[in-house]
Amino acid sequence: MEMLTLWMVVGFLLAAYSVIANDSVQTLGTWMASNNERVSYTTMWAAASAVLLWALWYGWYAYGGDISYGRLNKIPFQEVQWYHALAPGILLLLTRVGVPVSTSFLVLSAFASSFVLEKMLMKSIMGYAVAATFAYAVWWLISKWLDEAKPVEESHKVWWIRAQWVTTGFLWWTWLSHDVANIAVFLPRTLTLDLLIMISAVFVFGLYWMFREKGGRIQNIILEKHNTRYVRSATLIDLFYFVCLYFFKELNDIPMSTTWVFVGLLAGRELAIATFTGKKKTKSVFPLVGKDFMKMMVGLGASVGIVLLIHMVIVPNGL
């Protein structure tokens, strides 16, 4: 087994808990919201864990021991110090108060150069804009032939449930191929088999805790949106979020904020529903969208603060 330092272990554990408690709700939240009343949390945990283990082990095999899917190619491994572990600690605090923080910015900012951070920011801004525009256009089309608030016919319900489980599985795998890098950054870039087994156990336990807590406070971002508890709406959100993430996954290996893509998708959807269906007044949507956007800015501000603290105060001659 690789020699692990204290700060490497602390940073990894904090990042693993924070990422699973914060970002995983983006991908599993709508699925949880629409299944909580008919499926036990242990069943959902087992299903999500199966996809999680496949994503980890496939990435490890396909990328020569690198579970980050090559997302850390431009962020070389460096000895983990206390200030690196500070980032996921801050993320943990923000998560507990329900702030949808960009884990990629907050965690990777402690390791990446300013050049890489600039590329991450530009890709994430593009992700928010593309997701919002895409969602607005898609839900404009959906509103032409489908009323999401109308109950699903009993004969169709089983097909929507199956479709949701399939789309959530693909979305969960695609998201993991993006955001596992936020945890793997604390680890050697090539993992041994015994270390991979230990990491898998930590991830599965963290996922169990998240399901037991029903997503925590971050889940409120999903629950307060229009009809997200309905299986049909949840399936459509998961499907188009998967399309957006897969596009950016294939675009290049620069890390990005999946949080920004998710919030952008929900913003575009809410605006489309308000504009084209009359279910909500458009002016009532802007405070909701604005609140989520401001919370994202809090996370970005914390990330910038960490960068300045490390590169200008703690290690002024570093990256």
Model-flagged regions — what are they?
Residues 1-319:
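Multi-pass alpha-helical transmembrane bundle typical of ion/small-solute transporters
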